[in-house]
């Protein structure tokens, strides 16, 4: 049994060739059409000299061509590299060089950036350009239009041998440092991120053809992953759909009004998003439509799934009020662990802080001595994943040794997320240790404070960082994007958050901003938030705290 991603996709293609696989705008592809175009793309790469394990970059928003390329890359035995479409030249140069990229697929709108970087990245010899309505010149650097390249290549499925040991590279977002390439075996990432484990039982799906057989026996589910394909969660939703004969809806931009309209138009069954950064605009859009008397037919929608980012309790409650009888899930995971745990959101949940989830059997919380934290002990530990985990970071032995550790004979992935184990065995996420705040010896995790802040009616979005404090070393600083027409004060926020978190965690200074900077997938940019606090004085500082940069 070879649990290779290309093989798994081909099993579904053979089972349901006439079924719609992809929808984007007014375009759609059946599984058979996807197969033909992906084969052509794979052969084009091979004809251009791309070899097994060579790296091919995908610098595109969500659209049909990116999935054709993803499938074609694994068919050719190459390795895809997800490129953040917000990266500017310096970041692109780093990623292109770090990944040893030899080929690139990009949307035409990014041609100027690509042109500026290519002279410094001479290993990139093959460039395909996806038309997107822009008119940037790509012929100056030898770019070839995507579909014209495919026309010249073979549509046949005649490729070399594949293995479950082939490498799948998943680059991290780089919001707390340089992006790192996480190296997964195909079988391992299939098991923990791409649907190779039964969701209900937690047991591996043993039959290589199992998902394809289910596809042939059942009508398709329509999945709509909103985050960009650079995000592991969207790659997960896409591959899971393709292995199971489902339909994937793709939209290049996040527009909350258009999301609800797309669900109405395409009878979407499963919606995927990343925490508050997408949930809050979606909720506001749905409320505005309701007030305006606009009705969407959302009867097909039965699952709303948030992954990999803070999803505040207050927003969950409001979604349940507007969309009763739906399943709403909140999951944890990372590029280094895959999914680690999920909770089904229920009415009346009273806990604060980060997500509270039921972890899977291969996820544990370890204390400082490497022992599993006992439920209800109050001990804080780190999330650790065993079993199907990555090989390490690409070209970074030092960071690999720091993150992937063998403890008591068991190898774990430990990316640095802290958590507490509740008395019932569920786990409350506290946040990444690298962005924690040390105030007077107390360790404070931003997500818990951010969740409390975002429960205030005047707060649209917020990030929390530590700033220098002459007495405590650091204190908690809030960078807040207010709702339109409001200006929350530090005293108002103080009074609100004290009802949810301990006093030492309460923000002592406040910066108001027009927008919170996040990655395209909604991940917080703490470096940006730190820069805000360093570049200008605070709008308010608590009377008992004197910050060096206060007004």
UniProtKB/Swiss-Prot annotation:
Gene: fadD19
NCBIfam families cross-referenced by the UniProt entry: PRK07798.1
GO molecular function: acid-thiol ligase activity; ATP binding
SUPFAM superfamilies: Acetyl-CoA synthetase-like
InterPro entries according to UniProt: AMP-bd_C (IPR025110), AMP-bd_C_sf (IPR045851), AMP-binding_CS (IPR020845), AMP-dep_synth/lig_dom (IPR000873), ANL_N_sf (IPR042099), ATP-dep_AMP-bd_enzyme (IPR050237)
Catalytic activity: a medium-chain fatty acid + ATP + CoA = a medium-chain fatty acyl-CoA + AMP + diphosphate; a long-chain fatty acid + ATP + CoA = a long-chain fatty acyl-CoA + AMP + diphosphate; (25S)-3-oxocholest-4-en-26-oate + ATP + CoA = (25S)-3-oxocholest-4-en-26-oyl-CoA + AMP + diphosphate
Disruption phenotype: Not required for growth on rich medium, nor with cholesterol as a sole energy source. Cannot use beta-sitosterol as a sole carbon and energy source, it can use 1,4-BNC (3-oxo-23,24-bisnorchola-1,4-dien-22-oic acid) an early intermediate of beta-sitosterol degradation.
Protein name: Medium/long-chain-fatty-acid--CoA/3-oxocholest-4-en-26-oate--CoA ligase
Gene3D superfamilies with a match to the protein in the record: 3.30.300.30, N-terminal domain of ligase-like
Pathway named in the protein's UniProt entry: Lipid metabolism; fatty acid biosynthesis; Steroid metabolism; cholesterol metabolism
Species this chain originates from: Mycolicibacterium smegmatis (strain ATCC 700084 / mc(2)155)
Binding site for ATP: 172-180, 417, 432, 523
UniProt keyword Nucleotide-binding, yes or no: yes
């Amino acid at each position: 049994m070879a649990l290779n991603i290309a093989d798994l996709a081909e099993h579904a293609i053979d089972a349901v060739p006439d079924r719609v696989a992809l929808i984007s705008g007014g375009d759609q592809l059946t599984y058979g059409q996807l197969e033909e175009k992906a084969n052509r793309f794979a052969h084009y790469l091979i004809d251009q000299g791309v070899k097994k394990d060579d790296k091919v970059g995908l610098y595109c928003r969500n659209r049909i061509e990116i999935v054709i390329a993803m499938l074609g890359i694994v068919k050719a035995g190459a390795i895809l590299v997800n490129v953040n479409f917000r990266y500017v030249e310096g970041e692109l140069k780093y990623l292109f060089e770090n990944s040893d990229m030899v080929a690139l697929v990009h949307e035409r709108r990014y041609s100027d950036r690509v042109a500026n970087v290519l002279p410094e990245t001479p290993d990139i010899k093959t460039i395909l350009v996806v038309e997107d309505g822009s008119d940037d010149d790509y012929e100056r650097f030898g770019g070839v239009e995507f579909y014209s390249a495919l026309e010249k290549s073979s549509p046949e499925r005649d490729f070399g041998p594949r293995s479950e040991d082939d490498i799948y590279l998943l680059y991290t977002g780089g919001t707390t440092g340089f992006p790192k390439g996480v190296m997964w075996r195909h079988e391992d990432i299939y098991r923990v991120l791409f649907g190779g484990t039964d969701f209900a039982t937690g047991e591996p799906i043993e039959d290589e053809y199992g998902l394809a057989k289910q596809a042939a026996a059942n009508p398709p589910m329509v999945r709509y992953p909103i985050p960009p394909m650079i995000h592991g969660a969207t790659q997960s939703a896409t591959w899971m759909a393709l292995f199971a004969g489902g339909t994937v809806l793709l939209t290049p931009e996040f527009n909350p009004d258009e999301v609800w309209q797309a669900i109405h138009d395409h009878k979407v069954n499963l919606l995927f998003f990343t925490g508050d950064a997408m949930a809050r605009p979606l909720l506001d859009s749905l409320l505005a439509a309701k007030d305006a008397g606009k009705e969407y037919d959302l009867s097909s929608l039965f699952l709303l799934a948030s992954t990999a980012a803070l999803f505040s309790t207050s927003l969950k409650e409001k979604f349940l009020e507007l969309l009763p009888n739906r399943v709403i899930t909140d999951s944890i995971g990372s590029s280094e662990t895959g999914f680690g745990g999920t909770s089904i959101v229920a009415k009346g949940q009273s806990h604060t802080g980060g997500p509270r989830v039921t972890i899977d059997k291969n996820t544990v919380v370890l204390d400082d001595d490497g022992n599993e934290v006992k439920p209800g002990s109050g001990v804080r530990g780190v999330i650790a994943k065993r079993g199907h985990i990555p090989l390490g970071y690409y070209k970074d032995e030092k960071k690999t040794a720091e993150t992937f550790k063998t403890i008591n004979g068991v190898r774990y992935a430990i990316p640095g997320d802290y958590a507490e184990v509740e008395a019932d065995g569920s786990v409350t996420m506290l946040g990444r240790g690298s962005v924690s705040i040390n105030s007077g010896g107390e360790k404070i995790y931003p997500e818990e404070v951010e969740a409390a802040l975002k429960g205030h009616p005047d707060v649209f979005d917020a990030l929390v960082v530590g700033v220098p404090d002459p007495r405590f070393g650091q204190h908690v600083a809030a960078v807040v994007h207010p709702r339109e027409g409001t200006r929350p004060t530090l005293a108002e926020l103080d009074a609100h958050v004290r009802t949810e978190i301990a006093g030492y965690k309460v923000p002592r200074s406040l910066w108001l901003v027009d927008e919170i900077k996040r990655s395209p997938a909604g991940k917080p940019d703490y470096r940006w938030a730190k820069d805000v606090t360093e570049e200008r004085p605070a709008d308010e500082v608590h009377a008992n705290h004197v910050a060096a940069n206060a007004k």
